[in-house]
Swiss-Prot record:
InterPro entries: Hwtx-2-like
One CC-aspect GO term: extracellular region
Family: Belongs to the neurotoxin 12 (Hwtx-2) family. 02 (Hwtx-2) subfamily.
Domain of life, source organism: Eukaryota
Protein name: U4-theraphotoxin-Hhn1c
Gene Ontology molecular function, alphabetical: toxin activity
Tissues where the protein occurs: Expressed by the venom gland.
The UniProt record lists the keyword Signal: yes
Purpose of the protein: Postsynaptic neurotoxin.
UniProt subcellular location: Secreted
Removed propeptide positions: 23-48
Keywords linked to the UniProt accession: Disulfide bond, Neurotoxin, Postsynaptic neurotoxin, Secreted, Signal, Toxin
Disulphide bridges, residue numbers: C52-C66, C56-C77, C71-C82
Amino acid sequence: MKVTLIAIVTCAAVLVLHTTAAEELEAESQLMEVGMPDTELAAVDEERLFECSASCEIEKEGNKDCKKKKCKGGWKCKFNMCVKV
């Protein structure tokens, strides 16, 4: 009787762990499908870098502190480059 009970509890625990791992794997695969390809991310980074540098150069010529207005959405301008905050 004890052996049967232990076997049932063990099988139930393995089933729960397997189901949890499968759900995590499915969630990760869905996140990967939604994200942008690396080439698009690189283009966005280059665009942010250019906007920040151009904005900074314009403000420096006017003898103003370099307050970046182009770096938004979790980015800030530092040393003429947009960096992730």
